[in-house]
């Protein structure tokens, strides 16, 4: 269980961040990468990149294991709660699992098997909030088109629901735009 960060103050790469606590032999390394993606206007720029890399990797591991990507994450979170590896994880596994279960239900993940719809999922904990998404995409004239996004957020008590909705929707649009057009 080891983390090597690149010396960036307040790095989002943390020794106690998921999937820490759920897997043995965990190593996370951080380094700089030249990219054409601008970060000036990103919302929480360092966390976005870590989340994207982490979630893509978890999808690859789930696929290699022959497991559903949401169920795979839920298995890891169950292990992190019942038999944690290490101590002092900075997330609450049950809250993390809660947003995954909710987005799985709302998106009818297990039953929506339309072969023309490509689905993806991601979940992340950062800034004291748990977020899980399911994105449905179709191809139109050879180009990807986002059809629908499902989102579940557990950020604790929400004082201003409109502001929370605006932040979530703006973050989704920002992230989708960068993923589709900046890479």
Predicted regions and their residues:
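Generic, well-ordered alpha-helical scaffold segments in large soluble proteins
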Residues: 57-64, 75, 99-107, 137-140, ...
């Amino acid at each position: 269980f080891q983390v090597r960060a690149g010396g960036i103050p307040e790095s989002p790469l943390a020794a106690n961040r998921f999937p820490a606590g759920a897997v043995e032999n965990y190593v996370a390394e951080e380094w700089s990468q030249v990219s054409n993606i601008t970060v000036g206007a990103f919302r929480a720029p360092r966390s976005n990149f870590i989340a994207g890399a982490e979630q893509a990797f978890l999808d690859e591991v789930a696929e290699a294991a022959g497991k559903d990507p949401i169920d795979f994450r839920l298995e890891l979170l169950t292990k992190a709660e019942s038999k944690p590896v290490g101590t002092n994880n900075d997330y609450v596994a049950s809250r993390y699992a809660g947003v995954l279960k909710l987005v799985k239900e709302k998106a009818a993940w297990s039953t929506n098997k339309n072969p023309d719809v490509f689905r993806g999922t991601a979940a992340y904990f950062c800034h004291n909030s748990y977020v899980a998404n399911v994105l449905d995409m179709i191809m139109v004239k050879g180009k990807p088109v986002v059809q629908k996004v499902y989102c579940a957020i557990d950020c604790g008590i929400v004082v201003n629901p409109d502001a929370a909705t605006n932040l979530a929707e703006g973050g989704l649009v920002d992230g989708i735009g960068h993923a589709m057009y900046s890479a």
